[in-house]
Amino acid sequence: PFFRNFLQTFDKSKYKNIGMIHLHTNATLWTEQMWESMSNVHDLVKSIEISIDAGTKKTYEKVRRNGDWDMLMKNLEYINTIKTLENVKLSFVIQDDNYKEMELFENLKHKLNNIPRVRTHYYKLLDWGVMKNFEEKAVWKSNHKNFAEFKSIWKNFEKIINTETTTHNLVGVL
């Protein structure tokens, strides 16, 4: 709420040196009404990252607390109409619940075909000290029960992706 309120009341005269704003969002609240409430920053918002972490409704609603896949898809359609956006990154935190959906997630780029540059990025799940079941979820770790399957899926996935628009932080892991 703080950042939303900040953007809704943003006064360019107070921040004359800001030439661009990058937003990181899950896009569940990114409706036309919400975007219009921030009209004073439209020309500054050139880049956004949208955390999705799934390729299907079922998984999204499992890994995203209070996730609404249908609302997300509707909001992605709206985001695709925003003329000032130059860069959109869709992000996916790899975990035991979603690693089989990477290819489906990759296809979400096509929903943003009006944006000049759309990328996907795959992050390995990290332990920030608050997740009780980290070891159970961290499928990218070599001691995970599903690591061999994940590694095989990842190796096949790497063969079909465009490395100019798809990046990851799994270097040194596989």
Cite the ranges covered by each PLM segment:
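Structural motif corresponding to alpha-helix initiation and N-cap regions
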Residues: T31-W35
